[in-house]
């Protein structure tokens, strides 16, 4: 599952769980982007976003977090993400889960022509968001029917944008994201106007504990 995860919230986790159940996936790998090339806003430090994702997914043995995008130099392109994941899992069939709104702009993605050769795409959307195949016309209209699946996830009514705004306004984040992520956001003073404390996170390692 690719995304900025700035911050990760229950919508992401429910979407991952639902898609895993729908397609019978053995595991879901969350891949926080390193340097998102399409974002027109400031994005939190990659290590903060990575650690929040680790915290959020730690209790689910089917979930894991990859650093392939964070550790790769330069802007994050989905093509490179999928190639790296293929190299790490050469015998696995890949399903790339991303927001349906991102799929709407797929023709502007770097190397989009090769993306559907690398993975089956699953676009997850919030309730009421309409994305028809006609929105991604042209060559993509010739894709096999099983190349792209759109799934509506009610929990995606929660958004990272709203979570950031609530944090900036000192409003509660409880029940929008896992408790550990709420505490991390508070401790690191993320999304606040004033700079946060000088806390080094580059070498931080979290113990996720043993899974049942």
From Swiss-Prot:
Query: Could you identify this protein by its name?
Result: Probable nicotinate-nucleotide adenylyltransferase
- Provide the catalytic activity annotation: nicotinate beta-D-ribonucleotide + ATP + H(+) = deamido-NAD(+) + diphosphate
GO terms of biological process kind? NAD biosynthetic process
Q: Which UniProt keywords apply?
A: ATP-binding, NAD, Nucleotide-binding, Nucleotidyltransferase, Pyridine nucleotide biosynthesis, Transferase
Key word Nucleotidyltransferase present in the record?
yes
Similarity comment text for this entry: Belongs to the NadD family.
Highest taxon of source: Bacteria
GO molecular function of the protein, one example?
A: nicotinate-nucleotide adenylyltransferase activity
Question: InterPro entries from the entry?
Answer: Cyt_trans-like, NadD/NMNAT, Rossmann-like_a/b/a_fold
- Coiled-coil stretches are none
Which EC number applies?
2.7.7.18
Pathway involvement of the protein, from the record: Cofactor biosynthesis; NAD(+) biosynthesis; deamido-NAD(+) from nicotinate D-ribonucleotide: step 1/1
Tagged with keyword Nucleotide-binding? yes
Q: What does this protein do?
A: Catalyzes the reversible adenylation of nicotinate mononucleotide (NaMN) to nicotinic acid adenine dinucleotide (NaAD).
Q: Kindly name one Pfam family recorded for this protein.
A: CTP_transf_like
């Amino acid at each position: 599952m690719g995304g900025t995860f700035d911050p990760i919230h229950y919508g992401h986790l429910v979407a991952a769980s639902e898609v895993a159940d729908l397609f019978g996936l053995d595991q879901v790998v969350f891949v926080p982007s390193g340097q998102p090339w399409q974002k027109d806003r400031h994005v939190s430090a990659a290590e903060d976003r990575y650690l929040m994702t680790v915290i959020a997914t730690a209790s689910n043995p089917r979930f894991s977090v990859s650093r392939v995008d964070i550790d790769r130099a330069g802007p994050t392109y989905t093509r490179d993400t999928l190639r790296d994941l293929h190299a790490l899992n050469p015998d696995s069939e890949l399903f790339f889960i991303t927001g349906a709104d991102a799929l709407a702009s797929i023709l502007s993605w770097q190397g989009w022509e090769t993306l559907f050769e690398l993975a089956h795409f699953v676009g997850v959307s919030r309730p009421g968001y309409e994305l028809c195949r006609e929105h991604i016309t042209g060559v993509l209209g010739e894709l096999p029917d099983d190349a792209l699946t759109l799934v509506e996830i009610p929990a995606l009514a929660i958004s990272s944008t709203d979570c950031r705004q609530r944090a900036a306004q000192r409003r509660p984040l409880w029940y929008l994201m896992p408790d550990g992520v709420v505490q991390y956001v508070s401790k690191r003073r993320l999304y606040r106007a004033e700079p946060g404390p000088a806390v080094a996170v580059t070498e931080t390692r979290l113990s996720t504990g043993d899974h049942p």
